[in-house]
Amino acid sequence: QDSKAPAHMFFKVDDGWIAAYNMGEFGAAVYWFNSDGKKRRKLSDHQINQFMVDNGRIFAVEGLAHLGLSRGSMIELRKEKGQWSAEEFIPFPGSAEAIAQVSSGDYVIVTSDMRLRVNLEKELNILIPNGDWGSLYPNSAAIADDGYIYIGMRQFVVKCKLSISVQSFTFLVPDKAWLNTKKE
């Protein structure tokens, strides 16, 4: 991946920036750049979709869903002895598209077709094994005070109970006036 291309996503760190380039099936890369951009170092080929910080630790969810293949993970970005690294923290059975923090060390992960719950002890629970929303491209997740998680995707929002025991979901569909009805 050419690090001079526009970054898909970036994250400010104490000595510069972590930049993620994600071109889907055409490749990906994660780079560290110093503050003025003159120095850089490639960290990995992970396909980062979202960064998250928990108690000073930097995590990201990553993955690729393409032509029937879906793989992903949660990675941790760490600085040791002045050098940044990106290492897999826990693998997932699908492309990790979004993450939401339930509490410190406890997260909900949205994959291309599933909803997972993971923690820093690397325990993984599959809450919704087949969300059947892959073609809607989930891309964000938020936990609300009402006990629900809301998953943003193409033209829809999915509403799920945050509870581990309740594993159903509802599609929130906007009024027809809001839908993309342009025909080409």
Residue ranges and their predicted role:
Residues 1-35, 41-75:
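Acidic, serine/threonine- and glycine-rich low-complexity intrinsically disordered segments
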Residues 1-2, 38-43, 84-90, 124-131, ...:
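A short beta-strand motif characteristic of beta-propeller blades
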Residues 143-184:
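Blade-level signature of beta-propeller repeat domains, shared across WD40, Kelch, NHL, RCC1
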